[in-house]
Amino acid sequence: MSSRWLNFHEKMIKQRMEKKVDSRYFRDGAVKKPYSAKTLSNKKSSASFGIRRELPSTSHLVQYRGTHTCTRQGRLRELRIRCVARKFLYLWIRMTFGRVFPSKARFYYEQRLLRKVFEEWKEEWWVFHHEWKLCVRADCHYRYYLYNLMFQTWKTYVRQQQEMRNKYTRAEVHDAKQKMRQAWKSWLIYVVVRRTKLQMQTTALEFRQRSILRVWWSMWRQQLGQVRVSRALHASAVKHRALSLQLQAWSQWREQLLYVQKEKQKVVSAVKHHRHWQKQRFLKAWLEYLQVRRVKRQQNEMAERFHHVSVLQIHFCDWQQAWEQRQSLYAYHAQVEKLARKMALRRTFTHWKHYMLLCAEEAAQCEMAEEHHRHSQLYFCFRALKDNVTHAHLQQIRRNLAHRQHGVTLLHRFWNLWQSQIEEKKEREQLPLLHAAWDHYRIALLCKCIKLWLQYTQKRRYKQRLQARADGHFQQRTLPAAFHTWKRLWRWRQQDNVLNARATRFHRETLEKQVFSIWRQKTFQHQENRLAERMAILHAERQLLHRSWFTWHQQAAARHQEQEWQTAACAHHRHGRLKKAFCLWRESAQGLRAERTGRVRAAEFHVAQLLRRAWSQWRECLAVRGAERRKLMRADRHHQQRVRHRALQAWVTYQGRVRSILQEVAARESQHNRQLLRGALRRWKENTMARVDEAKKTFQASAHYRRTICSKVLVQWREAVSVQIYYRQQEDSAFWEARKVLDRGCLRTWFQRWRDCSRRSAQQRLQLERAVQHHRRQLLLEGLARWKMHHLECVRKRLLHRQSTQLLAQRLSRTCFRQWRQQLAARRQEQQATVRALWFWAFSLQAKVWATWLAFVLERRRKKARLQRALQAYQGQLLQEGATRLLRFAASMKASRQQLQAQQQVQAAHSLHRAVHRCATLWKQKVLGRGGKPQPLAAVAPSRKVTFEDPLLNCIAAGAGDATVGTKRPQAPLLQGALGCLAAEEPHARELNTAHSARKQPRRPHFLLEPARSQRPQKPKEHGLGMAQPAGPSLTRPFLAEAPTAQVPHSPGPGALSSAPGPKQIPTASTGPELLLLPPSSFMPCGAAAPARASAQPATPRDKPQVPPSLASVPDPHLLLPGDFSATRAGPGLSTTGSLDLEAELEGIQQQLLHYQTTKQNLWSCQRQASSLRRWLELSREEPGPEDQEVEQQVQKELQEVELQIQQLAEELQAQRQPIGTCIARIQALRQALR
């Protein structure tokens, strides 16, 4: 939907611009002269195309030429007609005018006619050029407006998503709070019910104790065990609210205590029994609470100890690793400084040698370039003289120039190949010595590393044994506590996950409903807007067609009259002398044909010989190079295999030993864990059996007690319970019926009703308890005294038990701390020894890595030097080809102009005759007297308009970075006609071009073909034979400049939209894009892995990796980037921590610089866009119209949006300057360190 809407919007704006252009020509009923067929082909509007199709031809000559000039016979026939018409015209002038000199009249008429035609052409050319610029700027502005619109919509969408997420999080938090409140209320009710039940159980036990005094103590113990079992079962529910329960119990206990003290002061005798009963109940609860708190405190202490020990161990390990890394970095920096001092002399020597070679090569190239330039200047001068002397030998001179230029380019290429071969031979002579030195150094380093590694493994085994012992001792104490805590946490998390899943489902359903409703509203509004816009566009098109039809009808009537007068005058001159001119032309054509065929055959034979020699020499050179590369690759592979085999054997032995040690440790750990689990299971079984027995006994006693109590209380309780059950059943039935109908929001009201019911039941229970209180008081008088004594003894025992446990805990903590200190001292000594060994091993390994990296850097610099030479040669070749093509284009333009002048002479013959006749009659009347009235002259035919267009200047303007580069300018039909004539007159050049386009191009490296990623619009390719390549950054810097790429057909760009409604262009001689032939030196591989990389490159241009533009801005070629490391094969010792850190840092710096460059380019493009929009507004305000107000308002809105975007980008650049400065300082520091 979005892509279709954008295409439709672009078409609408383009049609509005075309209406504006057409309204300037048809304003106020004044009809200007229509455009010719060549100018109308450039405008891609449906209205102008319909007008051009309906225009009649001016004369039979134009119609005849338009139908026959596409073939060779048609051109010959046209030439014959021109010659015959010219001869008849001269004879008729002599016969009619007599003593009047026609040369003077013709000279006067030609001057007037040329001045008039030039003024009209200048005016129309200026209008067309100005309107074309406005159209291109409008297209560019509209494209940037669409980009900005899409970005703003995306921004708003992201903000809306963020706001929705915030709302959802708030709703989830609110829902969680509400659920917690409801759960807490239900939990309070549950606690109240539980307390009442416990109170009833205590009363039953007291009654039983009074009846049977011997069983009283046993029953109390059973009840205590039952309470403990129930508390253990409900521990998971009470865990998260323990603190709140503690505070609540303490406050209740304090209030009750104050209340008892007050009652004592008032009535001592009446409150004594009640106070004893209150004390008994609260002391039981308090003792149980103290027991639970003591257990929790012990668990928390154990968990804190375990946490402290684990945190200490983790922080100590982290500190040790950081210290080791710091020591390794210090050693690495010292080694780097030493190696830099050692390699300074080598580097200076290599730089000096490389500089001398470059100077010699540059001097030789400059001399060759000067000689070639002199020869080319002399050749061009001679060619200009020959063109002035005679036009007959023009084609032969062009052929000779092309062949000589081809020979010079071939010699230049083979000279570059020979130089590269000599340089490679010199490098190969020095390679064996370097390889031998590197092998000796690697072997010595490997021996040292192996010795140190053996010592390190022995120490490491001893450390592992000690660590295994310490870990086993540590696990014996902490494993059971950790297991219990993990079990509780797991249960709690399961409940939490279930609640979260329900909440997420509810929020997801609500979100889907809201999004669907919003999307439906937006689609309906979008459809209505599109229908309204289509209706407006159709109405405007109908009005435009009506105006164009009226103007065309008037113009056609006038031209029809002019055509009839011209045909009557030209029919007499055409048919009389046709046979004579044809005979003369046939004799001259036969001689020209014979000369042309001889020249073509000689040129073809010479070119074939040159191609055979060049191909044979190039084949031999490639064969020699391939053999040398294969030998070097075999030697490198053999050396790499030997080194890998040795390293693999050492690594396998080390891994085997490590595996055996780890297996022994794992077996011991598993054995120890099994023993611990078995002991824990045994204890758990014993405890569970004891608890089950106690539960059975308590259940039997409680059952007997209930039977005795229920028999007494059941009569009164049945009536109250039956009434209560009846009310509850009614309320429950009403509640379940309402729950099916109402939503989740009705839960609160239901909860309030349920709370009222619970309050009523609690009030009834309190009434029952008051009735039983009198009976309890009498029972508690005798049991309370005995229970006090027993309670005091229990308190003393508990205090003694606490003191003993505290003393044991202190002794254990002291012993553990002493052992831990001893282990810590031993570990520190072992770590210091390992750090020293690792430091020495890292030092040797870094030396090895530095040597390999240095070799890699040297090889990379050599490759860069070779690529620079190939670039220079390629640039010279491109300049030569551009000069030759420019000359060919100038010659073709000259020939086309001559043909156009001849056509204009034939077409203006009748108008010239009328003018001369008028002058003669006026002169006769003045000399001889007025004999009669002069005949009215026929209307002068409108002169043909010719537009000239220089593609080279357009290409240069496109390369300079104008704002109009984004659109594809169509090629003028005049240029196509000139190129067609050139191809017809030069069959040899046409055959060479077809062979050049059909020939398969050799493989080229990816850095010469891939365009750089940038924010500027890409430049379209220029098609045709006579078009020169764009001069600009692509000639001087082909590595990093933007390569011209053809526009994708299915892309919704303005070029594709503008070419849709207009007529199709006439295809030129070369239909495909013109590929550049690169020299063979640019196809040399960059290293040993070049063939594999070249074969692995994708075939399509979309999947090719693009070179980042930040590489072009790097001032120092000695600083390597991470892409350079990844492009070549990695050595055996490049995987070190220092190099990885350096690569990561350089990648981050590169990303920051790329982001800064992209923002800067976006700011430039927005500024250009704003300037183009301001110019367009100024030009439109100079010539205002009624239809331009809407377009001007839209453009003003777009200009405001672009200015806001410019302000935002400027602020971003201002904020990014400080981090970019830090990145540049870091790069300079790295450069100094590497130097």
From Swiss-Prot:
Region: Interaction with CETN2, residue numbers: 104-123, 468-487, 634-653
Region (Disordered) location: 994-1120
Cysteine pairs bridged by disulfides in the record: none
Keywords, comma-separated and alphabetical: Cytoplasm, Cytoskeleton, Repeat
GO molecular function: phosphatase binding
Compositional bias segments (type: Basic residues): 997-1006
Written domain comment of the UniProt record: CETN2-binding regions contains a conserved Trp residue in their C-terminal ends, which seems critical for interaction with CETN2.
Subunit (UniProt): Interacts with CETN2 (via C-terminus).
Function text: Plays a role in the dynamic structure of centrosome-associated contractile fibers via its interaction with CETN2.
Protein name, as recorded: Protein SFI1 homolog
Organism: Papio anubis
Name of the encoding gene: SFI1
